[in-house]
Amino acid sequence: HADLRLAQLDDVLNAHEEAAEGLFRGIRHAGASAGDIQGLAIPGGSDRNLMSNEAFRAGVARLGERGLTYDTWLYHFQINDFMELARALPATTMILDHFGTPLGVGEFAHQKEAIFEQWKEDIECAAACPNVFAKLGGLAMPDNGFGWHERSTPPSSDEFLEAQARYYEHAIACFGVERCMFESNFPVDRLSIGYRVLWNGLKKMTSDFSEEEKDLMFSGVARRVYRIDAK
C-alpha cells in the first residue's frame, strides 16, 4: 500500500521496489467511501472525492509512468468516479476489484434489483476504458447482502452460482476474457463461503468456455497484468 496523494510518493515506491526485490507490481489505494451508510461490516473510509483529487490523480499517473498498476476497491455508486479517473489517465493500467461492490445491506437492502440494473450499465461503461481490467470475486462479503455469513452452513457451489453467476457473466461479456481475472478475496470471503466451493463454482460456471479462455481468466490475465513469471 501507499497513499498516492503523498508528495514523497516516489520515495515510498522506491522503498517498495527495494524491499520486494523485483516482485513489486502495483498499489491498491482503496477508494471505498462509506460516509454515513449504516449496517456495513467493512465500511470503507476513503475520501468521497478521492478519484478527482489532483494529488491522487498525479499519484495514479506516476504509477503508470513507472510501469506499475493501480487496484481499487470501491462501492457501486462510485464506479462513475472511477471511470472518469480511467479516462483521464489512459496510460495507467487499472484493476477494478470485487465488481465495484454492489451493496445490499442497510439502505440498499431492498434495492438489489435496481442496483443490479444500474451496475450493469456502469460496468459496461467501465469496460469501454481499454486500460481497465476486472478482478472478479469478493461478492460473498457480508456487505453485498447475500447473508451467507449468518447461516449455520455455507452455500454450495450451486447456490453460489444461482445467486451470483449473473454478475460474473455480465462482467465477462463486457470486458471479455482478455481483461477478466478471477479472485477468491480470501480470507475476507471466508466469512461466507468455502474456498474450494468458490473455485468449484467458478469451474462450473466456465464449463462452456474453451480451455484457452479458462486459462486466461483463471491465471493468464493476472500473469500478464501483474507480470508474474509462472515457472
Walk through the language-model features, giving the residues of each:
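A generic structural motif
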Residues: 1-2, 28-31, 96-103, 213, ...
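Mid-domain alpha/beta scaffold segments of enzyme catalytic cores
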Residues: 1-66, 88, 109-110
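Short catalytic/ligand-binding loop motif for oxyanion handling, primarily in non-cytosolic enzymes
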Residues: 5-7, 35-38, 80-82, 102-105, ...
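Short aromatic-enriched loop/helix-cap "lid" or pocket-rim segments at secondary-structure transitions
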Residues: 38-41, 107-109, 145-149, 193-195, ...
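Short glycine/proline- and charge-enriched loop/turn segments
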Residues: 42-44, 148-154, 196-202
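Catalytic pocket-lining loop regions of alpha/beta-barrel enzymes
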Residues: 49-181, 213
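Mid-to-C-terminal alpha-helical segments outside catalytic/metal-binding sites
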Residues: 166-181, 189-231
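Active-site glycine-centered loops adjacent to acidic/histidine catalytic or metal-binding residues
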Residues: 185
